[in-house]
């Protein structure tokens, strides 16, 4: 694991949750250029509203992010906004930095007020425990996650070594367009505000916005990137070679984290990748891939190892994309092999036992060849199991 210069991390148990860590802080020695992408849900949690306001005013002066898990601080009215601000104010006081340099985030049960005495005590403890180890922070932001999600990447730009580190949480309520997931990316790159915003948006569109666990979109989701410039490179501007090199590093981090979220889907036993090939345009390819990976009927078919290919074609049909259904070829693929199940929009004879063997693997790929263009899109998801119902039926207990 590589850690970018100038960043430190902490995670503590402040008793919002009964046992596990539940409050984390990321801190930069110097002000950072920052950018964020937030939930598309009309119902936005207090921390989302607060952070959007702060980033609008101070996108080049962020020093810290404080995150709690266990309580979402969503649907909490004016008191929720007061509590979000109190989180920032307490963090600023303990770190001796301006309050407008602090972002906040929450994840957990909706409609419950934050226990602010516990939160403020946790902030004090977390500041004392800041270190170069990001693992405690990764543990502190988990809710129904079963494992931490961290990935890092090094890249050399104009002779300067730059590090990108991402930490995410998410396993349920994951649906295309940012849903119940938090991701915090830190880098020591020196990058302009406009370039940072652009590369984050492009990357999120092809990573977190192309995954699905259960079709729900959360009130709290956000991806935040902080760049403190301590790598010492010349400021990276839009559309330069340096921009695309940094983008590739950031996108690898986001893509790996997105796949880790899918792999940790609540109750999941299989990861599903959908690849739409030779589509008439990129938007159609994305719409179709997302519709297929989000289909509960497709998810349950994969769980049951049932090559029910009609569900895939049906999902493509209601995606909103316009295409000729009589030209579609469909394949299932895994480490056990590959099988064609439809050609030119109609079923073909195939061996059911072979298909079941292919679908029995932990990673299954659905390939839809549209034969109507050259565009490609991929989306990722997981199967839907009885365990998912069990986990979410007992979420508050």
Swiss-Prot record:
Q: Which GO terms describe its biological process?
A: L-arginine biosynthetic process; ornithine biosynthetic process
Which residue positions are annotated as catalytic? Answer: 180
Q: Where does substrate bind?
A: 143, 169, 180, 266, 392, 397
- What controls its activity? Competitively inhibited by L-ornithine.
Top EC group:
transferase
Marked site, Cleavage, at 179-180
Q: In which pathway does it act?
A: Amino-acid biosynthesis; L-arginine biosynthesis; L-ornithine and N-acetyl-L-glutamate from L-glutamate and N(2)-acetyl-L-ornithine (cyclic): step 1/1; Amino-acid biosynthesis; L-arginine biosynthesis; N(2)-acetyl-L-ornithine from L-glutamate: step 1/4
Its localization reads: Cytoplasm
The EC number(s) this enzyme carries: 2.3.1.35, 2.3.1.1
Q: Does the keyword Cytoplasm apply?
A: yes
On temperature dependence, the record says: Optimum temperature is 90 degrees Celsius (OATase activity).
List the catalytic activities from the record: N(2)-acetyl-L-ornithine + L-glutamate = N-acetyl-L-glutamate + L-ornithine; L-glutamate + acetyl-CoA = N-acetyl-L-glutamate + CoA + H(+)
UniProt site positions, description: Involved in the stabilization of negative charge on the oxyanion by the formation of the oxyanion hole: 107-108
One annotated GO molecular function: L-glutamate N-acetyltransferase activity
Gene3D superfamilies attached to this UniProt entry: arginine biosynthesis bifunctional protein suprefamily (3.30.2330.10), ArgJ beta chain, C-terminal domain (3.10.20.340), L-amino peptidase D-ALA esterase/amidase (3.60.70.12)
Q: How does activity depend on pH?
A: Optimum pH is 8 for OATase activity and 7.5-8 for AGSase activity.
Q: Which GO terms describe its cellular component?
A: cytoplasm
* InterPro entries membership: Arg_biosynth_ArgJ, ArgJ-like_dom_sf, ArgJ_beta_C
Q: Mind listing the UniProt keywords for this protein, alphabetically?
A: Acyltransferase, Amino-acid biosynthesis, Arginine biosynthesis, Autocatalytic cleavage, Cytoplasm, Multifunctional enzyme, Transferase
Described purpose of this protein according to its UniProt entry: Catalyzes two activities which are involved in the cyclic version of arginine biosynthesis: the synthesis of N-acetylglutamate from glutamate and acetyl-CoA as the acetyl donor, and of ornithine by transacetylation between N(2)-acetylornithine and glutamate.
| Subunit (UniProt) | Heterotetramer of two alpha and two beta chains.
Family as reported in the entry's similarity comment: Belongs to the ArgJ family.
State the protein's name: Arginine biosynthesis bifunctional protein ArgJ
| Protein species of origin | Thermotoga neapolitana (strain ATCC 49049 / DSM 4359 / NBRC 107923 / NS-E)
């Amino acid at each position: 694991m590589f850690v970018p210069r100038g960043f430190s991390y902490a995670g503590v148990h402040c008793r919002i949750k009964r046992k596990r860590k539940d409050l984390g802080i990321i801190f930069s020695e110097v002000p950072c250029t920052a950018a964020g992408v937030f939930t598309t849900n009309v119902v936005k949690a207090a921390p989302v509203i607060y952070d959007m306001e702060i980033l609008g005013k101070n996108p080049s002066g962020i020093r810290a992010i404080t995150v709690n898990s266990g309580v979402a601080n969503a649907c909490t009215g004016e008191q929720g906004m007061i509590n979000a601000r109190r989180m920032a104010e307490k963090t600023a006081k303990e770190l001796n930095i301006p309050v407008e340099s602090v972002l906040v985030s929450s994840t957990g049960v909706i409609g419950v007020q934050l226990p602010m005495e516990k939160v403020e005590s946790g902030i004090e403890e977390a500041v004392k425990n800041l270190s170069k180890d990001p693992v405690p922070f990764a543990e502190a932001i988990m809710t129904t996650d079963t494992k931490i999600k961290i990935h890092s990447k090094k890249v050399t730009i104009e002779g300067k070594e730059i590090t990108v580190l991402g930490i995410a949480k998410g396993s349920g309520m994951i649906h295309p367009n940012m849903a119940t997931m938090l991701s915090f990316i830190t880098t020591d790159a020196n990058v302009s505000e406009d370039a940072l915003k652009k590369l984050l948006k492009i990357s999120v569109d092809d990573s977190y916005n192309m995954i699905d666990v259960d079709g729900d979109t959360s009130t709290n989701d956000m991806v935040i990137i902080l760049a403190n410039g301590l790598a010492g490179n010349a400021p990276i501007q839009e559309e330069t070679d340096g921009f695309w090199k940094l983008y590739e590093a950031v996108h690898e981090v986001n893509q790996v984290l997105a796949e880790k979220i899918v792999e940790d889907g609540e109750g999941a036993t299989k990861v599903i990748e959908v690849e739409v090939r030779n589509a008439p345009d990129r938007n159609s390819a994305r719409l179709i891939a997302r519709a297929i990976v989000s289909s509960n009927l497709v998810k349950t078919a994969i769980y049951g190892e049932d090559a029910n290919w009609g569900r895939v074609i049906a999902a493509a049909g209601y995606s909103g994309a316009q295409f000729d259904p009589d030209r579609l070829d469909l394949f299932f693929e895994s480490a056990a092999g590959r099988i064609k199940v439809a050609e030119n929009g109609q079923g073909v004879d195939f061996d059911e036992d072979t298909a079941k063997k292919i679908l029995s693997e932990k990673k299954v790929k659905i390939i839809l060849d549209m034969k109507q263009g050259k565009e490609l899109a991929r989306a990722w998801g997981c199967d839907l199991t009885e365990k998912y119902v069990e986990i979410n039926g007992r979420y508050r207990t």
